[in-house]
Swiss-Prot record:
CDD domains attached to this UniProt entry: Rab11_like
Chain positions of motif Effector region: 41-49
Name of this protein: Ras-related protein Rab11C
GO MF: GTP binding; GTPase activity
Disulfide bonds, paired cysteine numbers: none
Lipid attachment in record (S-geranylgeranyl cysteine): C213, C214
Superkingdom of source: Eukaryota
Family the entry assigns: Belongs to the small GTPase superfamily. Rab family.
PROSITE patterns in the record: RAB
Keyword set, alphabetical order: Cell membrane, GTP-binding, Lipoprotein, Membrane, Nucleotide-binding, Prenylation
Species whose genome carries this gene: Lotus japonicus (Lotus corniculatus var. japonicus)
Length: 216
């Protein structure tokens, strides 16, 4: 969703995390929204989401990040999970070649179910485990270039490029929404920012709270 309000934040953007189970999606979520990392995190069951409010080019943006289980038995939630998403972080594990080989399957699913204008970034996670690397950074870069995606290698453990990944996605979404708003205003004087998808009202969660396991 790309939804505009006038009070606590200017925009609410829904971003989905996708990729195989075990690639570190939940720790990316907790690192970005709560600055936490849990070494013994268990596989996600169903869907979780968390929020964080931050500044993007002078605007207050509330990022609503959704995390889903990677296991096939949870694929029934697919259409609802993608509905209204304006950004996606597609994650693979640099130490597990199979998770990289499955990236294109995840891309097909995303493009089948999500809005055609969705902003997608590919992230090679667990860059702190370079000694166990099974996917080169060049391979990741080549695939992302072929598919027209942004690309970074990340480490939720060391907090490497997590902030940059989400800032990049949110900034690109903001640019798209701003262009649509400008076009709408030119077409219809006084038109407001067009909504995308379904707006879901959720309770605000402070992104600055540090609690639970392995707080930093």
């Amino acid at each position: 969703m790309a939804h505009r309000v006038d009070h606590e934040y200017d925009y609410l953007f829904k971003i989905v995390l996708i990729g195989d189970s075990g690639v570190g999606k939940s720790n990316i979520l907790s690192r970005f929204t709560r600055n936490e990392f849990c070494l013994e995190s268990k596989s996600t069951i169903g869907v979780e989401f968390a929020t964080r409010t931050l500044q993007v080019e002078g605007k207050t943006v509330k990022a609503q990040i959704w995390d889903t289980a990677g296991q096939e038995r949870y694929r029934a939630i697919t259409s609802a999970y993608y509905r209204g998403a304006v950004g996606a972080l597609l994650v693979y594990d640099i130490t597990k070649r199979q998770t990289f080989d499955n990236v294109q399957r995840w891309l097909r699913e995303l493009r089948d179910h999500a809005d055609s204008n969705i902003v997608i970034m590919m992230a090679g996670n667990k860059s702190d485990l370079n000694h166990l690397r099974a996917v080169s950074e060049d391979d990741g870069g080549a695939l992302s270039e072929k598919e027209g995606l942004s690309f970074l290698e990340t480490s939720a453990l060391e907090a490497t490029n997590i902030e940059k990944a989400f800032q990049t996605i949110l900034t690109e979404i903001y640019h798209i929404v701003s262009k649509k708003a400008l076009a709408a205003q030119e077409a219809t004087a006084g038109a407001s920012v067009p909504g995308q998808g379904t707006t879901i009202n959720v309770a605000d969660t402070s992104g600055n709270t540090k609690k639970g396991c392995c707080s930093t």
